[in-house]
Amino acid sequence: MTLWVLGLNHQTAPVDLRERAAFAGDALPRALESLRALPQVSEAALLSTCNRTELYAMADEARSLVNWLETHAPGLSGYLYQHQEAEAVRHLFRVATGLDSMVLGEPQILGQVKDAWAVARAHGALGSGLDRLFQQTFSVAKRARTDTRVGANPVSVASTAVRLAQESFARLNESTVLLIGAGETIELAAKHLSESRVRRLLIANRTLAHAQTLASQHGGYALPLTDLERHLAEADVVFSATAAREPLVTRVQVEQALRARKRKPMLLFDLAVPRDIEASVDELSDAYLYTVDDLERAVEDNRRGRREAADQAEAIIDLQVARYVETLQATTRQAPLKRLRAFGDSTRDELLAKARQQLHNGKPTDEVLEQLAHALTNRLLHPPTAALRDAALNNDLELTTAADRLFPEKPGYQHPPIATPIVRTDDADPAP
């Protein structure tokens, strides 16, 4: 089996394709089950965020993985990147460290990678190969963040959106802000907004208790999602980041809100993939919509400023990839030896137990030893004998050459006799 990663992200695919490729909620366990059902796949994990969807797998080949992704989201094959073995390891290390993120060094991605590992593990999609890789990934990401400043003072998508809101509404302390959702992105936005002392903070979520918790932490007001349309006109700024499969805010709703506001401008940030706000809202006068792709341009300055720390982190990753691959190759080389030793040990134990039972039953010792030696020879030599016979029939020179090296033919060769130890006595002459 080969290690593969296939995926698309904010650099290779537009937001409309990323939202079709995303896995959310109950779709993720079902997708893992579907993947594991493929005969070419032994292990799998899925990482799905607003900026990327990636499939990690131990599989015979990549074509079956591409076909599976195409079935999930037709038309994405032209946007996919694909890595295998060492380059797949490097890619995951870079992703978890934040080096492949829209916001360089952002900390949220490591938690999302851990979530992907936990879900795959909980649903039986991980084996020793991917589990070992993810465990090493967490260690490498932690070291890169500890030994460099790649994660220092991180600028998140949420903080970038809040900064743009501050630039658009010079006095956020006189504005009403509506947050839709209660996940990590909205939590970060709420934190930055409360620090900006917005006049009024509304938080709408499908689970009201989650909205109430967030509202109590940041001095806001919690709303059930069913009240969203009724309160939309009150918002000068809207931030939305949920896992909904369909838009929560429609063009019609925003048009109605603008009329109620007497055309007073609204600023909307859609931080979700799939999108929470209909794209056509941006066509409305007095409505200004930003998506995660728009925010990428806004964070480019931050990316340039963190390049030195990123280069240091890249050097750490290069070293750790080399060490991981070396360890993996050593383990792979040892595997046939371990299987051979285990086969020999189990065969010996089985036949020895049988011989002891025969002795216990009174069978002559010489006869038991003769049968034991004969059985051991047959049992141990049968697999290589059968393999060599097939190799000869199929003209497999590689295997027959290997057999010559394992069992060299030396006419007249005899094993040296077992040396008899020399017993020293007090009367013995000392060695000259």
Swiss-Prot record:
Record's keyword terms, sorted: NADP, Oxidoreductase, Porphyrin biosynthesis
Region listing for Disordered, in residue ranges: 407-432
Pathway the protein contributes to: Porphyrin-containing compound metabolism; protoporphyrin-IX biosynthesis; 5-aminolevulinate from L-glutamyl-tRNA(Glu): step 1/2
Signal peptide range in chain numbering: none
Active site annotation, chain numbering: 50 (nucleophile)
GO BP term, example: protoporphyrinogen IX biosynthetic process from glutamate
Domain of life according to the entry: Bacteria
Annotated site, Important for activity, chain positions: 91
UniProt-listed Enzyme Commission number(s): 1.2.1.70
InterPro entries per UniProt: 4pyrrol_synth_GluRdtase, 4pyrrol_synth_GluRdtase_dimer, 4pyrrol_synth_GluRdtase_N, GluRdtase_CS, GluRdtase_dimer_dom_sf, GluRdtase_N_sf, NAD(P)-bd_dom_sf, Shikm_DH/Glu-tRNA_Rdtase
Catalytic reaction annotation: (S)-4-amino-5-oxopentanoate + tRNA(Glu) + NADP(+) = L-glutamyl-tRNA(Glu) + NADPH + H(+)
Binding annotation for substrate: 49-52, 101, 106-108, 112
Entry's Gene Ontology molecular function annotations: glutamyl-tRNA reductase activity; NADP binding
Binding site for NADP(+): 181-186
Domain notes: Possesses an unusual extended V-shaped dimeric structure with each monomer consisting of three distinct domains arranged along a curved 'spinal' alpha-helix. The N-terminal catalytic domain specifically recognizes the glutamate moiety of the substrate. The second domain is the NADPH-binding domain, and the third C-terminal domain is responsible for dimerization.
Subunit structure: Homodimer.
Family according to the record: Belongs to the glutamyl-tRNA reductase family.
Any further remark recorded for this protein: During catalysis, the active site Cys acts as a nucleophile attacking the alpha-carbonyl group of tRNA-bound glutamate with the formation of a thioester intermediate between enzyme and glutamate, and the concomitant release of tRNA(Glu). The thioester intermediate is finally reduced by direct hydride transfer from NADPH, to form the product GSA.
Function: Catalyzes the NADPH-dependent reduction of glutamyl-tRNA(Glu) to glutamate 1-semialdehyde (GSA).
Protein name (record): Glutamyl-tRNA reductase
